[in-house]
Amino acid sequence: MPPEFSSESRRADFTNFCRNAAPLGDMRRVVVATEGASRHFEVDGVNAEELGWLFDLAGWRKPGNFTQTLRNAARSKFGWLERIPGRSGRYAATSLGISKTLPTG
């Protein structure tokens, strides 16, 4: 477990955030987990390895390949994630991704 994710109260908040969002599909779950990590663990994006831990915490089934799922969500067709410049393999949720995956209000 990455040290940023060690707080039990933050882990509980993250889990509630993910459950309340109730995303359907792997790409939406990746966006919700990425945004949840940003909000509740104050991290600057996530990588495929961290997503595995975050999916476990949220109680979600893992996709076959996190790296490919990240890339798909970041493709121009969707634009739900963006690569963080200078941070190899790290992605952050875009405002479009957040609007498409999180309930409003």
Where are these regions (language model features)?
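Amphipathic alpha-helical interface surfaces
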Residues: 26, 47-50, 62, 66
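Short amphipathic alpha-helical interaction segments
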Residues: 60-76
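A short, conserved structural fragment
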Residues: 74-86
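Accessory beta->alpha helical hairpin/"wing" motif in late/C-terminal subdomains of nucleic-acid enzymes
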Residues: 83-104
